Amino acid sequence: MRKIFYDFEVFKHLWLVVFIDYDTGKGKCIVNNEDQLRDFYNKTKNDIYIGYNSRGYDQYIFKGILLGMDPYYISSQIIEKNKKGYEVVKKGWKIPFNNFDISTGFHSLKQLEGFMGSRIKESSVPFDLDRELTESEIKETVSYCLHDVKETIKVFDGKREEFDSQLALIEAFKLDMNKFTKTKAQLSAFTLGAEKQPNRNDEFDLRFPDTLVVSEKYQHIVDWYKDPENLDYKKKLKVDVAGVPHIFAWGGIHGALPKIKDEGIILCADVASLYPSLMIEYGYNSRNIKDPKRYTEIRDKRLKLKAEKNPMQLPLKIVLNC
């Protein structure tokens, strides 16, 4: 199964795509030719396409062209109207497509190029041109697109474990390869048999564990969570615990010394599957999971594999932590 990196550039009167085979380094450029794109797809549809922001954009341009849609319409709906790709290319599900998105979700490709010390290449050809592109403009756009694909490969090389863990997750649970385009959270939900439910509007109906023991010194932290005034995701509590600055909020707890220099025996204490175990012990698992025992079984199997130093524990860890 080959890894094919790709990127689309779309104008009103022209579209183009650049593909690069990861293992051979061979590239292919297709400009405004639906037949060539269809032929390439038929030869590579069992391989994995990898792009930057391809989950939300490029794969739908690809699918839309194969379905006879106008790529510029698709692009403008996604970018300008802020629509989801599946809302625009409604029959996209009919096109089998093994897509993997290497984007971070926090940075643009250009930002990462800068972080990696690469030359940031910009195109002087505006994407809102309302005319045919000249030969020189097409040549520049191809060069720009090729550069972006090569930079995407660099990002991939730096985040290879993301791809490997995704593949391991699919193989461990014998999922179809067309699930590759899903996020790890989506794959985990599928693996656990979770189903989307209507909004219950009860996320602040807090239930504290009956085993919770807090000294008087830190009782104010528990009281902070009980205070109706603090039932706001923007609120947070900053307080020292055991001499260490902590931040308590609704996404969790973070505590660390700003900086420290020490010598001697330094211990690093860790608990295997701490949060999954707490979820199991106190019934804090997602109510969308039909059979909570499934989660417990995966936790137990993961701990067994980890003790055996079996690498197959990694995809199970992903499911537990998502």
Kindly label every feature range from the protein language model:
Residues 23-56, 61-322:
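Conserved acidic
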Residues 1-22, 266, 273-278:
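Gly/Thr-rich phosphate-binding beta-strand-loop-beta motif of the actin/hexokinase/Hsp70
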